[in-house]
Structure formats: structure tokens, C-alpha cells
Amino acid sequence: TPHQLDSMVNHQNWPLLLSDRISWEDQTMTERQNSETYVLSVPLKKNLKANVFGGVIKGQNLANLFSELTVGYHDSINFNKLPIPFACVSENIVNGDEVVFHNGVLATAMRASMAIPGVFTPVRLGDKILVDGGMKNNFPTNIARAMGADVIIGVDVQNDLRTADELNNLSEIFNQIINLTGQTRYEENIKLATVYIKVDVKGYSAASFNIPALDTLVNRGEEAAREQWTALQKLKKEIGLPENYVAPRHGPFSSLWASKDIFVKEITFDGIEDSDKKWIMHRCHLKENSKMRMEQLYEALTTLRGSQAYSNVSYKLTDTPQGYQLHFILEEKYERNLNLGIRFDSEEIASLLLNVRSRFDTRVPSWVSVTGRLGKRYLARVEYTLAPMQMRNFNFAYQFEYNDINIYDHGRRSYNTTYKYHSGEFGFSDVWFRNLRFGAGLNFEFFKYKDFLYNTGGQRLEVKPQHFFSYFAQLHYNTYNKGYFPSKGTDVQGRYSLYTDNLTHYKGHAPFSALAASWAGVFSLTDRFALIPSLYGRVLIGKNIPYPYLNAMGGENFGHYLPQQLPFAGITNLEIVDNSVLVTSLKLRQRIGSKNYVTFTGNVAFRNDNFFDIWGAKPVWGGSVGYGYDSLFGPLEASLGYSSRSHKVGFYVNLGYVF
């Protein structure tokens, strides 16, 4: 019904739907981290032909939406026998023929008819390569006539041809070429409409799917229809309908997707390992010869897409006399990706992050990742991962860093230190329920400090090159609905590390250790205003803690300069603090418009070398006010802060994802 169509259009996540991205909630925690680190990801595909005949977007999310909406019609069917007869148009770019779908798989026909060249990848069907039929027939009233329509009310949402002054960029030129290609047929077909309704779509395109654009276009459509009201009333009389006649509405239609459960006779998979089949069947509680909720099917789809192992995931649900047959079609990833991150801030000016990730065609899924960071501090990391089971990985990594860091004391720069850092890590990670990840392993670290440049009167340190072996265990739980500026969710992290210099002792004595934990929650009181409380801290356990592991506090983010760094609003720079630190914080965040945010932050830090005396020392308080813009290239932020430790106003600017 019209109401259902309106509801369907307004409730879609169009930016996600018109991309190949996986929604934040359905991504693995690794994918979430990558999506909030890199501004550009370029696939270096193994199959070159896919690049030649491809588009920017594969249309995986659209294809799954079409499959969802057409559940119960996944067989090859006659479209004329649908409750409302249907046809759609594509063009076969092999020979330029117009292809009119009157039968076949409904979802495939819909996907082929909207494959805009250069935007969405074409649909391969037998020996045909099909794209959007707009270049051949973008107002197909002739097809409606051929199907038996005596009366046609034609609604035209195509842009008029542009003038020379309006052709100023590649997109406008490309759209003009498409419109010119089918212009003759278009003008002929307008004459076949009994009532022709021309909607003013100036200023909008086929990609205008944000809420303001949708509302404007719907209103313009209504205005265009009312302009033809006299013609519509005249048509009503001509076909013999009384003035008080109201046409019976079709529907309301209900999708099988909305039903509670279905009986599934058989579940089959194409392109999946037997171990993965058993895992997904168990994970999503899928059983043959049993009733299944449609939510289980959706969970299986999102789990497979978010597993990082498959590039495309689709399904067919076919009705048989014995029950439904559920068939999953998967394309395994054997691809390489080049990822790029870039950011600017008021301290390090510019930083660049490059990453290449390549999967191997091995019996046990595996991949290698090579990362490099350029800037004031630089880094190189090589990581090899084995995944014997879905969501369970063994990681082997080596990392080198050169760091150049300023350390402050009560707001004044105390000294600058430069050092080289080497680490080798063996770890195991396991993801439970998509939002919870556990990790454990062994780490080797070597610190070689080169220079300490002190301000006049600063305390001198003697830090010699030193190596450490550490055991670690960590847990991370995250239910945010997005990485930056989330409107709901919780983040909980915890890590315990035990440090030695020979795997059992440190300098002939018991090892020392560190325990760090954090909690933060986002509670939206309205759709624009949110409270974000948090509690976090780090405790060092043992005597004579080496310099590289001393607690550090300051800045906007966890672990930005040092892994143990704790953020604190009002302390702009990095300061070395006591062995036990506990911080409580509250943020008040107001969204202005759709992407602008103003945030007020207040926090208090309790600290002492002895954890049991942490309440005895005078606490440090601080606060800040900041502005942020949620851009396509990451957060653009600026803040002013003040604290009782520095006793001065600090200013900080960050442009881009933090890494």
C-alpha cells in the first residue's frame, strides 16, 4: 500500500543500504576498529575481471533487502501472476539489447534493473551482463501498454536535460549522456500516458535519500499530482466511475519475513567450509526438519557477513511440499586491501597510517597485515593471523616504534624523550556474541631510550635499555551503535599484565603487574541530548616499577602516546602520575543539526602510590568544553580545558580518526 511504501522508504538506513558496508552492530570488533581508523579502503581484487566489469558498489545490502521483501517468491515465477502484475527493464551491455523481465527470480530482476553503470556492479545472468534499463527505456509506458493497460497514469521523476551552463562536473555529464541515449524513446513514451505527471526533482538525484530530501520529494510529488487533479477527475468520468467512487486498496501486504516461524526441511550451503557450516548452524540454532524464526535467518546472514571470511552472502528460501529449502550462497574472500588513515592535530601536526591486508588461500584461513605510520612518531607492524575456527584467532606480531614525546609536570614541560621500541607478541583471541572479545598471550618488549632533554631545574632520570617478557589477559565488551558520537551502548574493558625479565622473575624478585579497567555508557535522554558517565583507572602492583610502565594521564584518548595513557579533560599534555589512578568522568553532549556536537566534560582523578590510600591525597579535577563535527573523514574536534593540576587553559584540535 502507499502507506507501507512510505514507511519502508523512511525507515531505511539509506547510507548503509546504498553501500557495501556492514552495519556497525553486525561487524566484528576488528572491523569496527578498522572502520573508525581508515578513511579509505581500496580492494586489490584477485579477480581482475570483477574490476573491469564492476562498479563502485556491489549492492550486497540492496540485494539482501530485495531478498527479504520477496521471501516466498524466490523461485522462478511469472510476474504477471503476482498480486499486482510487475515488469522491469534492464539493458544487456553485451549487445545493447533491452531486456524486459516478465518472469524469473523477482529479487534478481529488481537488482538488475537498478544497476546504474559505474555505480553498482552489473548482474550476470547466463550470457548477459545487465545494467539499469534507464539508458534504453526510462519511462516504459510502452511495456505497460503491451501488458494490457488501457489507462496509464505516468509519473515522471527524471531530471530535464541540462543546459551548457549546468554541465560542470563528471557526474552531471555522465547523467546527461544516459538521458540523451534514451531521449527518443522517452519522448515517444510520454505520449502513451493517459495522464502525465511531471515531478520537479531539481536539486536532487537518484542518490538523494536523506530524510529532508525524501520529505521534499514526496511533497513535490503531491503538488505535481494536485496540478493534474482536473485531468484525473476527467479521466475518472471517462472510464465511467461515479464521483464518490473510491478504488479498493490492495493489501495491506505482509511479508513472510514478518511471520513468526516457518518449517525448514533442508539447509544447504555453497562456498563454505564444513567447519564453518557446523559453526553457523550451532551459533544461530539452525536445524533441518524444524521450525525456524526469520530472525534466526537474519542473524545467520549478519554473522556470516561480519565474519570477515566472505565477501558476498545471499540466500534463497524455496517452498516445497515438504517445507522450505534454505540455501546460502557465499563467496569467500581471497582479496587484498589497501587502507589509508590520515589525521591532523595541534600537537603532532600530521600523521599518516598505511595498511595492507592480504588473505591466503590456505586450508586453515589466515592473513597477514602490514601497517606503517608516518609523522613525528613512526611505526611499523607485521601481523600474521590464523583462524582455525570462526571468531577464534591466533596472532603472531612484530612491531617497531620510534617515539618522540614531551612529558609535562603540572602544566609545564619537564622533558622530551626519544626512544626506540621493539615488541614481539603471540596471542589468542576469541569473540563471544559479537560484542565480547577475550584475548591472552605472551609479549616481548625492548625499550632503548636515546635522549632526555630537560628543562632547567627538571629532575634527571637514568633509564637504561631494558627488555621485558609479559603475560597478559584482556576482555573488551562494546555495544555502541557507532564508534564516534554514539547515541547508545556500553563499553567495558579490562587488562591484566604480569611483567618479568626472564619469564619467571624480575631482577631476581617477584614479577610486578598492572591492572587496568574502564567503563563508559551512553544514555540518550532525548534524540539529541546524551549523558556519558565513565569510570576508569590503572593500578601498578609491585615495587620499583620501571620507567616505561609508569602511569600517565592527559589528553583526549586512551593509549594515544603510551599504551598506559589515561585521558583527562583539562590536562592537554601527557603527565607522569602516581602508581594508582582512578578517574570518574561525566560528559553532557548535545547534537545540533545532524552532525554537529557540543560536549561539556567534567572529571575527577584520585591518585596515590598506594591503592589503599587513594582517597587520602587531594584529588585532581578538570573540565573542558568542545565542539565536534561527524564528517566522512572522521571527527573534526576542538576543545578548551582547565584543570587544578595545570592551572592554565589548554587548547586541542583533532581532525580525523585517532590512531
How would you label these PLM feature ranges?
Residues 5, 96, 132, 144, ...:
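Buried hydrophobic packing residues in well-ordered domains
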Residues 90-93, 102, 199-201, 271-273, ...:
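Flexible glycine-/small-residue-rich
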Residues 295, 300, 306, 312-484, ...:
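Gram-negative/organellar outer-membrane beta-barrel architecture
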Residues 401-405, 443-447, 493-503, 538-540, ...:
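Short glycine-rich beta-strand segments
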Residues 2-302, 306-313, 317-318, 333:
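Patatin-like phospholipase
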